[in-house]
Amino acid sequence: MKKQKVTDIFLYRWRYVFGYTLLTLLYIGAIIISALHVPGGLSQAEIDMVNTTNHLNFSVEGIAVTNLPFHLLQLLFFKLFGVSLLTIKAPAVILSIASSVAIFFLLKRWFKPSTTILSLLIMATTGQFLFIGQSATVGILYIFYTALTLLFATLILQKAQNASIWRISLAITTALSLFTPYFWYINLGLLIIAFLHPHPRYFLISRKHRKSWIVPSAILFAIGCAIGFLCYKSHALFYNLIGINSLSFDIIANLRTLYYTYIRIFPSVVGNQITPIMDINAMVLIGLGLFRSFQKISSARSFMIWSWLILALALLIFQPSLTPIIIIPLFILLAVGLESLMNMWYGLFPRNPYARGTGLVFISMLIIVMVMGGSFRYIDGYRYFPEAVSRFNKDLSLLRKNTASTDSFSLLVSKEESPIYEALKKHNYHQISIIHTAPANVGQTLYVSHRVKSQIPQTYSGHLSSVIVNDHKDGDRFYIYTSDRK
């Protein structure tokens, strides 16, 4: 009887397919749970994004807004499914899943399957990636456009099949990214740097490839002209896209923010996000990857990573809140560091299976510690760290739980939180009225949010019939006043 080899076992032959599938399901589940439960609320930045979506209309002035593709996608979800915590965050969740798929194919092109799986496992459980992936803010667009740009550029440079499709896709991605502040700078910098490296330059200007860029260039030019026209109609859009007014020239304060964000080991909150955004193990692997990629900087891959890294770091010095713009290069460097660590160990014992097995055990333990540590830090941090928990408004879900869309009542809220309730009135609760000052007399039932409860005078004629609460500090979220004492 012929002895069965390990390579003949079904699970072994399909191990990478099972690994990729498991990772995909793991990340989709993690990002949806994050959107609904951890942190389970809306930051002020997310509420401000809803405000922009509320004021969209299909006139020239109405669509002259930054991050237009995101707002259009959010508006589509509001039209189809109404306004809820999930529909507000749905565009970010979808773009996050699409970004993770793009990163998977990018890493698969650059690394061995084992390195790809381990790197994606770390990425999928990193607090920063999970946080940005569930946050309905501009952060996810920086990750999305970065992942697609690097993927399509890699497919073109590696002469993948259907090269014309990847060129057109790169042109569309580049054009749409111009709706996001500061991406003009990244795109322009990458184009200039591409001409400095012989390999990308060959694919851009050689006679053999010039004609293949005609259609992509036309698409990029057309969308660019449309954005230019919108900027001509709305000077505010132009200044927002350029981003000069948002830069901070207090270099010392900016460097301190970056120190808190990446290096300082004690937890704090910077821009609604718990820092440091990566643990010490990940930073060590990134440092190793940085060193290894510098040794091979002449290669197209290392040149691309370092180019993006330098451009992003130059921007972060003046705008330290733009951490999402550097997250993809950092994860690629982490993969480089992980691959280097494995190669270094296997290089020490090329023919000793026991030593190689021991190294595999140690590396597996490192990955497990990073995955479990990242998951617990994210979940426990946004559930129990007081400074972080207080940054997120969970009142929308609470109000929907305790009312019906056919109810008629007045809702007294602050101007800061008003956008989510205006969206709710527009798409779900058509019978309610949103007010910002307390009425003199009670007409219909009045709901008063926690933020403006002090506006209700003690001599108010209405009767406080009940209070809607949650299980957090300052849990008195809505005060309900009626005209009688039923």
Residue spans for each PLM region:
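Membrane-interface transmembrane helices that cradle and orient dolichyl/undecaprenyl
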Residues: 109-113, 149-169, 176-177
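Signature aromatic-anchored transmembrane alpha helix within multi-pass, membrane-resident enzymes
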Residues: 338-377
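Transmembrane-lumen/periplasm boundary regions of multi-pass, lipid-linked membrane glycan transferases
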Residues: 38, 42, 49-52, 80, ...
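Hydrophobic/aromatic-rich transmembrane helices and adjacent perimembrane loops
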Residues: 132-133, 139, 285, 302-350
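Start-transfer (signal-anchor) and selected internal transmembrane alpha helices
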Residues: 1-32, 197-222
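Transmembrane-helix motifs of polytopic, lipid-linked glycan transferases
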Residues: 90-110, 148, 287-291
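Aromatic/acidic, Gly/Pro-rich catalytic loop(s) in extracytoplasmic/lumenal soluble domains
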Residues: 433-486
